[in-house]
Structures are given as C-alpha cells and as structure tokens.
C-alpha cells in the first residue's frame, strides 16, 4: 500500500500536524476562533498592503498625492485602501479579544506562547504606528512627531536617539522613507513570530474553557474546527466589507485629509482608536518620563500575568470574584479609550488619572489578592 502523502511528505506533514490532524479539545468555544481570524487579518493586510505599495511613493512631496492617486485612478484602489485602513482596526479588535480570552481562561500559564503573543502585540502596534504616518496627512505628521519625541524622555541618550530615528532634526523625508521600509518589513516579521507562537502552542496543545487537561477528549482539527473557522472568517469579513464600502472614514481622523504642514499644529493630536487607552495612560501623568514609563508599562504588564496568577483554578469560569474584576478591567479600558479621545481639560484629566490608577491596581494588586481569597473560600 502506498504511503499517505499527507502524513509522510516533509512539508505536507507539517501542514497536516498543525491544520488537519491536530488534536483539539472538543469543548473550545467561539473565543478560540480569534487566532485563526488574526491569521486571516494578517494575510489580508499583507495582500492589500503589497498592492498599495505598488502605487505609493515614499517622498514628502509626493506621498499624499500618491495615496489620492491610488484612490482616484487605480482600478479598485479606493477599495484596497479602505480594506487596508479598516483591516487594521479589525486586526486590533481581534487581537484585543484574543488577549482578553487568554486572560479570562488562564491561557497565560503557557508562558512561551503567552510571551511570544505579547511580543506579537508590540510588533503589531509598531507596524500600525509607522503605517499611519505613510499617507502624510496632518495627523500622520504630528502623530509621528509626538510619539517619536517620547524617546527624548530617556535620560542621557534620549535626544540623540530621537534625531537618529528621525534621520535629521525634525520629522521629514528620511523619516518617511524609513517608516515605509519598516512598515513593509514588520508584517513579515509578524508572520515569522506567528509561526514561533504556533510552535509553542502545539507543544502543549490548546487550553479549554474548563482549564483542565483535555487529553482524554480530543478531536481532529479538520473538519470540525476548520469549518468553525470558515464561519468565523465570514462573520469577520461581513462587518469589514460593510465598513470599507459604506463608511470607510468612520474610524479615521478628518485632519488626515489635509496634507502635512509642519507650521500648523492640529487642535487635538490623537492616535487611531486602538491606541487611545495607552495614550490616555501616557497623558494621565504630568511628567514626560513618568508618562512614557506608564505607557510602556501598560502593555509590558502583560508579561507579568503568569507570575500574578495565585488561584488554584486556571480559568475564571468558576471564579465569580475574579470575573467581576475582569469585567471591571474591561469597562476601565473602555473608559480609558474614551478619555484618550477627549481634550486635556477638566473633568477628563482626573477621570483619566483615576482610570489609569485603577488599570494598574486591578492587574498588579487586586487580581492576585482575589485569587488568594478564592483559594481560601474553596476550603469552606
């Protein structure tokens, strides 16, 4: 009998072990769909991005016009651009839900998988930031100026570092050129990191909503979860297409329809919605270095999740107190997102400061305390 090609061919064997015959817990819910959705987001972004790069010119005098040209004169250029810009928003929606799922169900206890995931988040944030600068509108220019300027808060080497990043004494042509190069490179880095992420995941197998070993009850990935994933793709593409076709500029900033002008500062500089929570934390501290440290800590705190887990149970499925805390954290992040979009004035300043304090208190102090308390309650 001839050997099964799918199981013996060096390349097909890898595909088979990770997409077809992969043993998967039978009880994983729709919250486990976001990994594959992130994969499809990445593929969509790389394809649309490649098509956009073919018509883009990374030069300060031509960048804005080249984007306008793509939308006006290139076949379906407007659609490709709208899909790429809004695809980024859906990418972040998926990654935030994916992280939330990992947090709720204790998936962070797979330390290597979790850590590579946090590195992926940081790389995605960097990619989105440099990408936002490319259309060279007002918000692109001033966003780049404000965020890169934060590096100057680093003692001793800060100013040198900023000028090195800019390629001059202000955000100008060299900055745009290198940001384009980085924006082209980073998605492929994300793809590589994704393979590492999956390699670590397949060492342990997926977690499940009960947080207990599921070795005794696993089913093949295909056809069960491959079908479920395709349904997920459809549910993702429907709102993406709706947004791109009906209201493509809903999530953008109107300032970006004005070409970059170093002499005119927009009244309110703010990043895209997916960075607003971190921006609110940055602004809540009235000191430059302190703000930068808080901004960095707001994301890097995720690395500490495995060490702050005190509960005897892995998931929050049967931990009502932790659940209450988790949903308070979600509400808190929504408040931070709202505050980030508001001007720096009363009462937004104090709300932002309280929300920032609450964010770190919940993650670093309350979660471990409540986990320990729930362990004690188990004894009654």
From Swiss-Prot:
Q: Which PROSITE patterns match?
A: CYTB_CTER (PS51003), CYTB_NTER (PS51002)
Quote the subcellular location field of this record.
Answer: Mitochondrion inner membrane
Which GO BP terms, alphabetically? Answer: mitochondrial electron transport, ubiquinol to cytochrome c
Binding of a ubiquinone occurs at 202
Cofactor info, note text: Binds 2 heme b groups non-covalently.
One Pfam family here: Cytochrom_B_C
Q: What else is known?
A: Heme 1 (or BL or b562) is low-potential and absorbs at about 562 nm, and heme 2 (or BH or b566) is high-potential and absorbs at about 566 nm.
Q: Protein name, please?
A: Cytochrome b
């Amino acid at each position: 009998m001839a050997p099964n090609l799918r199981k013996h061919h060096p390349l097909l064997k890898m595909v088979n072990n990770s997409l077809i015959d992969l043993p998967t817990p039978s009880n994983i819910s729709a919250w486990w769909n976001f990994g594959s959705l992130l994969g499809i987001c990445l593929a969509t972004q790389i394809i649309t991005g490649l098509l956009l790069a073919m018509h883009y010119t990374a030069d300060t005098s031509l960048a804005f016009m080249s984007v306008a040209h793509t939308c006006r004169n290139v076949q379906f250029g407007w659609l490709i651009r709208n899909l790429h810009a809004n695809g980024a928003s859906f990418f972040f929606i998926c990654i935030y839900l994916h992280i939330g799922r990992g947090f709720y169900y204790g998936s962070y206890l797979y330390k290597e998988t979790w850590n590579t995931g946090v590195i992926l988040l940081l790389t995605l944030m960097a990619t989105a930031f440099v990408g936002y600068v490319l259309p060279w509108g007002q918000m692109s220019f001033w966003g780049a100026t404000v965020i890169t300027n934060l590096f100057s808060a680093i003692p001793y080497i800060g100013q040198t570092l900023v000028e090195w990043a800019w390629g001059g004494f202000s955000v100008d042509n060299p900055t745009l050129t290198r940001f384009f190069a980085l924006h082209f490179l980073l998605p492929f880095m994300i793809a590589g990191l994704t393979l590492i992420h999956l390699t670590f995941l397949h060492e342990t197998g997926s977690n499940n909503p009960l947080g207990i070993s599921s070795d005794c009850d696993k089913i093949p990935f295909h056809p069960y979860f491959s079908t479920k994933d395709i349904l997920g793709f459809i549910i993702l593409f429907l709102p993406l297409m709706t947004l791109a076709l009906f209201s493509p500029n809903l999530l953008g900033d109107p300032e970006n329809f004005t070409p970059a002008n170093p002499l005119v500062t927009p009244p309110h500089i703010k990043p895209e919605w997916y960075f607003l929570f971190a921006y609110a934390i940055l602004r809540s501290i009235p000191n430059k270095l302190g703000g930068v440290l808080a901004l960095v800590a707001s994301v890097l705190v995720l690395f500490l999740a495995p060490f702050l887990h005190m509960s005897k149970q892995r998931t929050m499925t049967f931990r009502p107190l932790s659940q209450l805390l988790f949903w308070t954290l979600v509400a808190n992040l929504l408040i931070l997102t709202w505050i980030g979009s508001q001007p720096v004035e009363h009462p937004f300043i104090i709300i932002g400061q309280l929300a920032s304090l609450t964010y770190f208190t919940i993650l670093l102090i309350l979660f471990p305390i409540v986990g320990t308390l729930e362990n004690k309650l188990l004894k009654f």
